[in-house]
């Protein structure tokens, strides 16, 4: 991934996630119990990965910013006929940590 693609990719993923997680639902789609936590985990790992990989933004701002975005989504979901869940935010934060870790690992492998 080229360094100049991290910000546009992150913006695109952020917008997509925000719309998807705030879109009003009549009822949750049928899915196995807890599968939404996996979706949160993967989504926020995907969001943090490109920023950690390129290293243009410090890791602490990536962690705080992406985790705060997940928390903000959970706080405003009730305004969109969605339910807030602290466990969703925990899955977001774990995803951020793993996304950062994968980005750092890939950066290290690419340097060899």
What are these language model-derived features?
Residues 1-89, 93-112:
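Bulky hydrophobic segments
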């Amino acid at each position: 991934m080229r360094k100049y693609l991290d910000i546009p990719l992150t913006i695109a993923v952020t917008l997509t996630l925000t719309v998807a997680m705030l879109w009003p639902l009549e009822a949750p789609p049928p899915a196995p119990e807890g599968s939404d936590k996996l979706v949160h985990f993967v989504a926020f790992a995907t969001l943090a990965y490109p920023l950690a990989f390129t290293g243009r933004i410090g890791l602490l701002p990536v962690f705080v910013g992406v985790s705060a975005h997940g928390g903000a989504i959970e706080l405003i979901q009730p305004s969109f006929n969605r339910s807030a869940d602290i466990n969703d935010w925990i899955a977001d934060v774990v995803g951020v940590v793993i996304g950062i870790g994968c980005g750092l690992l890939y950066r290290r492998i690419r340097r060899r």
